Swiss-Prot record:
E3 ubiquitin-protein ligase which accepts ubiquitin from an E2 ubiquitin-conjugating enzyme in the form of a thioester and then directly transfers the ubiquitin to targeted substrates. GO terms for biological process: protein ubiquitination; ubiquitin-dependent protein catabolic process. Keywords: Cytoplasm, Cytoplasmic vesicle, Repeat, Transferase, Ubl conjugation, Ubl conjugation pathway. The gene is HERC3. It catalyses: S-ubiquitinyl-[E2 ubiquitin-conjugating enzyme]-L-cysteine + [acceptor protein]-L-lysine = [E2 ubiquitin-conjugating enzyme]-L-cysteine + N(6)-ubiquitinyl-[acceptor protein]-L-lysine. RCC1 repeats lie at residues 1-51, 52-101, 102-154, 156-207, 208-259, 261-311, 313-366. GO terms for molecular function: ubiquitin protein ligase activity. It is an enzyme of class 2 (transferase). It comes from Homo sapiens. It holds the Pfam family WD40_RLD. It is found in: Cytoplasm; Cytoplasmic vesicle. The keyword Cytoplasm applies. This is Probable E3 ubiquitin-protein ligase HERC3. One of its GO terms (cellular component) is cytoplasm.
Length: 1050
């Protein structure tokens, strides 16, 4: 071992000048025959830790800091620690700490500021004492400032004690100096790799390189861009991306080492200790440029000097104060730039093998510095050992991790010593968010060093693998401890304001625990986790949203299904909850978490929107009652307790409802508004009777009088004379000259006939796209706006009166009605040829887009046989489409088709539609759901069609003709079956409630076999003659379908 610097007592074996200065490296002869593991330097004393765990001290002993009564002119063993195996030592100005292999911490020396942690402020303690308050902890790492101490426990808990004059304990403003270890809660949850103390400032380093500083900052030694002291840990943001792996502190300056071997310094620079070729202070971390060409693996700070070791050359560089020889350069001058320490240094033994003088060279193993002294552990050529690399973190020194190795150790311990101490040790780690947060880091290309509000830096796959292993029966004892730890400690103690993003990984880890999926643990694990997530403050909550945006769809799907399952579990067992408020709290937490996930999914589309549906809800909850409660709540009214017991309304979370449930809600809303309109009419009628004006009485229905031969004109006239409130009434249609009572069939016939008439191509209101069989608003139309308004009202009335109509509009229409902007996919649906062409333009890989496609910002449209060119942007005919603007061209093209060219007609249509159907309930629908509600869907179940059919006349399900009919029908191909639906019901799609809601009717007729089947479209009624054979039935039915062109009305 070599040493240099200031030796006030002039220890034997070291040659000093009269002032006790050693200006260049000398061999410490007094301890050369012992194997030194570690050296700690205080203000004027040193502590030597040997490989065998013995501790020696020398130097000034005025406060008992040597731990023995002997003079300090040579290293003497501390007898009081002889029975302990010490693995780590640290020194303050006049006090010392020693850490045993059992995680126990001993202190001695000056104690007037509480720096010994012994719950007293004795001026001095000459014999090492155990710090009792930490006895229940396994301490892994300690560091001393001048008058304060830091300690890191295995479970990630961080303790400080001693002087707090500048906030160096990190406990906040209200705390004075502390005579016993205090937990620093502001860093909880962060997996810490290192703690380091300077004169009166402190640092903590996370496993992923986040640096936190606090305490004295008079010279900028915290790196926080100012010179203000900090009473609580503050994130040094300028170092976040530097992959910091080690920190060393001087009295008023700080040095950090990065994974790439770079060195940053900041703080006091009055002696050149920052190495920036100046004597200036630095308030921001600044890289030491002189060392940039070298890969540094070790750094150490003394009071006012800094050391850096470069293994490739074997050289130690020193800079800063040299007045007491502490730089080892052979002189006592201050040095502003890194300078090599004097001596014979070699990188490794191979470098020396050919040299005759190889035996005088030193190969550095580790450097130590403190106060005005420096020590170097080194080896000679013949017993070379590789240098310690501070960039490689020693797992024994930082927050314990949960992995295969620790699980194996715990399993063995629990099987051998299943006692309280063993269990408590395991539970301490398992209950620590910090331990879990550091256990599954994404180490591929150092990804975890990039941890940020957008990147969690965690390998969820390894999390999943570990939990799956733990589900094995051989780990049952560990699993039991994990379960208990999660239930009683970890989840209940999760903070609403995590100190850093690294403390938030636990929210991604916990959902991977398989027992969360088990309904037995919904109340004790799954729901409490949801509550913890929902308690998060705004910023951490946004971070979790960002991370959920980054996870794989499989993980996201599992999370959604987890809380859907919890909602179902709670609804099914709601009667078992003796305290209703508990049920409300639990289900609200599950629903709000699903809502949070749903909002994330709206942005990133991990899963389809219907993944959030809980179809079973319709059977577990009265949708009408729930909607009524929601409606009253929205209106600021309260329902009578006798009507509604629970305060949670599922309608507040519409994303969990499938299309059928939403349709039920819309129909409930329609019935509610119809009732309001009817009641209003009835009230007015009573008033009119009382005032003898019965002729002015209002009908409780929306009654339309129309003629078949002037259907459009009459409909326009009738609807124009009714108020918006009238449109909310139940619809009844009367065809002039016909006495039929409208029980629903006449209304359906009215819709079918009116829409067929309005959509007739002769009016030119809509353009028919042959390759998609769809209609869209014509961009050149000469009919009045009120025609489009009428179509809108008609479509709204159809929905309002639960009637499916046969409309061939693309999904884009329903998107626009719900304020969703149509895109290229919608153009592909409407006009596949145009859509494919635009996609090819976007996908074209070459640079020659202009020459290949020859396009400008215009669109060609046919108007009454004439091709017209429309500009997509001002001056579009002079703007050529190129590689850089092609996306802009496609966006403008799509916008023209769906927005600009049809704005007038669509506005008239939507105002009519929304006049009837507008409102909050409509906003709950997805575009595809709104389309399915208006025109039905294609979820065919032909067996169900047969099972729900009704028979009249001579027919029954067992009648021979009926059997022949169904045999024939089920043999039809899909397109022919759809044609039958169109023939019988007026639409080839089925209502949103499914095939059962069609309930077709088949009745016998007296007609002979030569007659065709006849469909009464308005009533879903089929007149079926009694055919004698399957062949005749098939032929006649096929002929009827082939001859069908419009509505076959009775």
């Amino acid at each position: 071992m070599l040493c240099w610097g200031y030796w006030s007592l002039g220890q034997p074996g070291i040659s000093t000048n009269l002032q006790g200065i050693v200006a260049e490296p000398q061999v410490c002869g007094f301890i050369s025959d012992r194997s030194v593991k570690e050296v700690a330097c205080g203000g004027n004393h040193s502590v030597f830790l040997l490989e065998d765990g013995e501790v020696y001290t020398c130097g000034l002993n005025t406060k008992g800091q040597l731990g023995h009564e002997r003079e300090g002119n040579k290293p003497e063993q501390i007898g009081a620690l002889a029975d302990q195996h010490i693995i780590h030592v640290a020194c303050g100005e006049s006090h010392s700490l020693a850490l045993s292999d059992r995680g126990q911490l001993f202190s001695w020396g000056a104690g007037s500021d509480g720096q010994l942690g012994l719950m007293t402020t004795e001026d001095s303690v000459a014999v090492p004492r155990l710090i009792q308050k930490l006895n229940q902890q396994t301490i892994l790492q300690v560091s001393c400032g001048n008058w304060h101490c830091l300690a890191l426990a295995a479970d990630g808990q961080f303790f400080t004690w001693g002087k707090n004059s500048h906030g160096q304990l990190g406990l906040g403003k209200e705390f004075p100096s502390q005579a016993s270890p205090q937990r620093v809660r502001s860093l909880e949850g962060i997996p810490l790799a290192q703690v380091a103390a300077g004169g009166a400032h402190s640092f903590a380093l996370s496993l992923s390189g986040a640096v936190f500083g606090w305490g004295m900052n008079n010279a900028g030694q915290l790196g926080l861009s100012d010179e203000k002291d900090r009473e609580s840990p503050c994130h040094v943001k300028l170092l976040r991306t530097q992959k910091v792996v080690y920190i060393s502190c001087g009295e008023e300056h700080t040095a950090v080492l990065t994974k790439s071997g770079g060195v940053f310094t900041f703080g006091a620079g009055s002696c050149g200790q920052l190495g920036h070729d100046s004597m200036n202070d630095e308030v921001n971390p600044r890289r030491v440029l002189e060392l940039m060409g070298s890969e540094v693996t070790q750094i150490a700070c003394g009071r006012q000097h800094t050391l850096a070791f470069v293994p490739s050359s074997g050289l130690i560089y020193a800079f800063g104060c040299g007045a007491r020889g502490q730089l080892g350069t052979g002189h006592t001058c201050n040095v502003k730039c890194p300078s090599p320490v004097k001596g014979y240094w070699a990188a490794h033994s191979g470098q020396l093998s050919a040299r005759a003088d190889r035996f005088k060279y030193h190969i550095v193993k580790q450097i130590f510095s403190g106060g005005d002294q420096t020590f170097v552990l080194c080896s000679k050529y013949e017993n070379y050992s590789p240098a310690v690399d501070f960039r490689t973190m020693n797992q024994a020194h930082y927050t314990s991790l949960i992995n295969d190795e620790t699980i194996a150790v715990w399993r063995q311990k629990l099987s051998e010593h299943n006692n309280a101490n063993t269990i408590n040790g395991v539970v301490q780690i398992l209950s620590s968010a910090a331990c879990w947060n550091g256990s599954f880091l994404e180490k591929k290309i150092d990804e975890h060093f990039k941890t940020s509000p957008k990147i969690p830096g965690i390998d969820l796959n390894s999390t999943r693998v570990l939990f799956e292993k733990l589900m094995n029966s051989q780990h049952s004892m560990i699993l039991e401890q994990i379960l208990n730890s999660f239930e009683s400690c970890l989840i209940p103690q999760l903070s609403s304001s995590p100190p850093d993003v690294e403390a938030m990984r636990i929210y991604l880890i916990l959902p991977e625990f398989p027992l969360l999926q088990d309904s037995k643990y919904y109340i004790t694990l799954t729901i409490p986790l949801a509550m913890a997530i929902l308690r998060l403050d705004t910023n951490p909550s946004k971070v979790l949203d960002n991370w959920w945006s980054q996870v794989c769809p499989k993980y996201f799907m599992k999370l959604v299904n987890l809380y859907k399952g919890a909602v179902l579990y709670l609804l099914r067992g709601r009667k078992t909850f003796l305290i209703p408020v508990l049920f409300n709290n639990y289900i609200t937490a599950a629903l709000k978490l699903l809502e949070k996930l749903y909002k994330v999914n709206l942005k990133v589309k991990h899963v389809e929107y219907d993944t959030f549906y809980i179809p079973e809800i319709s059977n577990l909850v009265d949708i009408q009652e729930d909607y009524l409660m929601w409606f009253l709540h929205q209106a600021g009214m309260k329902a009578r307790p006798s009507i509604i017991q629970d305060t949670v309304t599922l309608c507040s979370y519409p994303f969990i409802f499938d299309a059928q449930a939403k349709t039920k809600m819309l129909q409930t809303d329609a019935e509610l508004q119809m009732q309001v309109a009817v009641n209003g009419a009835n009230l007015q009628n009573v008033f009119m009777l009382l005032t003898l004006e019965p002729l002015l009485a209002r009908s409780p229905f929306l009654v339309l009088h129309v003629r078949r031969n002037n259907l459009v004109g009459d409909a326009l006239r009738e609807l124009s004379i009714h108020s918006d409130i009238d449109l909310k009434k139940p619809l009844k249609v009367i065809f002039d000259g016909e006495e039929a009572v409208d029980a629903g069939g006449v209304t359906k016939e009215f819709f079918l006939l009116l829409l067929k008439e309005l959509l007739n191509p002769i009016y030119g209101m809509f353009t028919y796209y042959q390759d998609s069989n769809l209609l869209w608003f014509s961009d050149t139309c000469f009919v009045e706006h009120n025609w489009f308004h009428l179509i809108g009202i008609t479509c709204g009335l159809a929905i309002y009166n639960s009637t499916v109509v046969d409309l061939h509009f693309p999904l884009a229409l329903y998107k626009k009605l719900l304020n969703v902007k149509p895109g290229l996919e919608d153009l592909k649906e409407l006009s596949p040829t145009e859509g494919r062409s635009l996609q090819e333009l976007l996908d074209y890989p070459g640079e020659d887009v202009e020459e290949t496609f020859c396009l400008n910002f215009t669109i060609c449209r046919e108007s009454y046989g004439v091709i017209e060119q429309k500009k997509l942007i001002p001056g579009g005919d002079n703007v050529t489409v190129c590689k850089d603007n092609r996306q802009e061209f496609v966006d403008a093209y799509v916008n023209y088709v769906f927005q600009i060219s049809v704005h007038e007609w669509y506005t008239a249509f939507s105002s009519g539609f929304l006049k009837v159907c507008g409102g909050k309930v409509l906003e709950l629908f997805q575009p595809s759901e709104l389309r399915a509600m208006m025109v039905g869907n294609s979820n065919y179940n032909w067996e169900e069609l047969e099972e729900t059919a009704i028979y009249k006349g001579d027919y029954s399900a067992t009648h021979p003709t009926v059997k022949l009919f169904w045999e024939t029908f089920h043999e039809f191909p899909l397109e022919k079956k759809k044609k039958f639906l169109l023939f019988l019901t007026g639409s080839d799609r089925i209502p949103i409630y499914g095939m059962a809601s069609l309930q077709i009717v088949i009745q016998s007729t007296a007609s002979g076999e030569e007659y065709l089947p006849v469909a009464h479209t308005c009533y879903n009624l089929l007149d079926l003659p009694k055919y004698s054979s399957k062949e005749i039935l098939s032929a006649r039915l096929t002929q009827a379908l082939d001859n069908y062109e419009g509505f076959s009305l009775a």
